[in-house]
């Protein structure tokens, strides 16, 4: 997997602001395990570039004048058997566009004012196959947008332990951290997380958490217990 055992993580930058792209490229180029494979100024360019360059991670502005980050993310997730991880970039944490991008299949989001170290860590995190979750921000997004899926978890048949694991995931914990909290093995947690995703029909942890909040399984007005 990219980012493990010294493997280089391939990245595609997508933003209509050339200065933003230049800043991101400078930050990422300073890291030996990160390689910016290409850039795009509009979401319409993304599918072709992804097929040609095969990036592991796409850093994409959520708001662009022609094809935005939401449409581009949705296209990648629905048209490719193994789409890259998508991190959407936004100026404001409560941007409704970000909420739509998460629903479309984005792995997480970053504020454009994030510190260089945070950007680098975010790319590495999602390249490992983990979702980039900021629990408070996700809660605020869902509470602010006021949208409810309602049926997302009904009939999913989650066991008590799977529900417990989902709540820990919603708090932003990694598999290793959940294993420590539950005093179980890492492989056991991975199995539970896999079962949760399969039962919810979720592509990744981010979509599972959004479904949990939307369905009322976790109240977006209060932190997950």
PLM features: residue spans?
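The feature encodes the CheY-like receiver
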Residues: 20, 60, 65-66
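Acidic catalytic/metal-coordinating carboxylates
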Residues: 42-45, 66-72
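Short amphipathic alpha-helix used as the core "switch/output" element in two-component signaling
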Residues: 48, 70-82
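Active-site beta3 strand of CheY-like receiver
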Residues: 53-59
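Short, flexible helix-to-coil linker/hinge segments that flank and couple to helix-turn-helix
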Residues: 96-103, 108, 112-164, 214-220
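Recognition helix of helix-turn-helix DNA-binding domains
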Residues: 172-207
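Basic, Lys/Arg-enriched C-terminal extension of HTH/homeodomain DNA-binding domains
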Residues: 198-225
């Amino acid at each position: 997997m990219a980012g493990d055992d010294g493997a280089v993580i391939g990245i595609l930058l997508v933003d209509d602001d050339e200065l933003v792209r230049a800043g991101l490229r400078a930050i990422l180029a300073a890291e030996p395990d990160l390689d910016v494979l290409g850039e795009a100024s509009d979401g319409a360019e993304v599918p072709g570039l992804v097929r040609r360059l095969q990036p592991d991670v796409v850093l994409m502005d959520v708001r662009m004048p022609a094809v935005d980050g939401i449409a581009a993310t949705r296209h990648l997730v629905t048209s490719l058997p193994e789409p890259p991880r998508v991190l959407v970039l936004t100026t404001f944490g409560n941007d409704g566009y970000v909420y739509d991008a998460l629903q479309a299949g984005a792995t997480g989001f970053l504020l454009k004012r994030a510190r260089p170290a945070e950007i680098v860590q975010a790319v590495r995190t999602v390249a490992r196959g983990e979702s980039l979750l900021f629990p408070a921000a996700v809660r605020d997004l869902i509470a602010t947008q006021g949208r409810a899926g309602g049926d997302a978890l009904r009939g999913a048949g989650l066991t008590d332990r799977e529900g417990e694991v989902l709540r820990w995931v919603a708090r932003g914990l990694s598999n290793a951290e959940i294993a420590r909290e539950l005093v179980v093995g890492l492989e056991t947690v991975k199995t539970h997380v896999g079962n949760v995703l399969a039962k919810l029909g979720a592509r990744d942890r981010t979509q599972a958490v959004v479904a949990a909040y939307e369905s009322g399984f976790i109240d977006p007005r209060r932190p997950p217990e």
